[in-house]
Amino acid sequence: MDPMIAQGALIGGGLIMAGGAIGAGIGDGMAGNALVSGIARQPEAQSRLFTPFFITVGLVEAAYFINLAFMALFVFATPVK
């Protein structure tokens, strides 16, 4: 395998994971912010706010794991000569 292709695949995979981690962190933070502000406004609505929060966090983390799969495809499926 050409070393330039391997280096490019590893750098690209690292950038993919960095972007996914940053996006997941921002998404989880925004969902947590909405949860805390909603509970601060209406403490009695806490039980109703947790379900959408966990669904949102689950979807954000699912997107991160899809990103992980694309990174693995990008890094480990490089052409071999």
Curated annotation (Swiss-Prot):
The record marks E61 as: Reversibly protonated during proton transport. It holds the Pfam family ATP-synt_C. It is a multi-pass membrane protein. One of its GO terms (molecular function) is lipid binding. One of its GO terms (cellular component) is proton-transporting ATP synthase complex. PROSITE patterns: ATPASE_C. F(1)F(0) ATP synthase produces ATP from ADP in the presence of a proton or sodium gradient. F-type ATPases consist of two structural domains, F(1) containing the extramembraneous catalytic core and F(0) containing the membrane proton channel, linked together by a central stalk and a peripheral stalk. During catalysis, ATP synthesis in the catalytic domain of F(1) is coupled via a rotary mechanism of the central stalk subunits to proton translocation. Belongs to the ATPase C chain family. This is ATP synthase subunit c.
